[in-house]
Each structure stands twice: as structure tokens, then as C-alpha cells.
């Protein structure tokens, strides 16, 4: 499994970047960590070979 993050607040992004993201904000490191935590938990035990896109809808918007 893979976590594919979009723009994350740990990097310096232009303020206008938020305008291109359907949710209207930059993602957080905590959101990526929570997704990773889920993937390694027993709750995701039957999920295999998946790419989880965590980008606030950016990919869908393209």
C-alpha cells in the first residue's frame, strides 16, 4: 500500500496554492500520519496493493 500526499503544510507553498485545491486548504502532516496509521492497523487488514490519495481532491480536480 502507498500513501500519496498532495500539498502538505510542512513545506513552504505559495498562498495561491490553496485556490487550486478543491477543499480550499493545504493538508497537514497529521492527516498523512493518520492515513498511514490506519493502513498499518488491523482495521486495514484486508486492504492490499492500494494507493491512497490524500490530496484534498487535487487529483480529481485535474
Predicted ranges, named:
Residues 36, 40-44:
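Short, hydrophobic alpha-helical segments
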Residues 2-21, 31, 61-62:
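A glycine/serine/threonine-rich, flexible loop-to-helix segment
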Residues 1-9, 40, 53-55:
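Conserved SDR Rossmann-fold cofactor-binding beta-strand/turn motif
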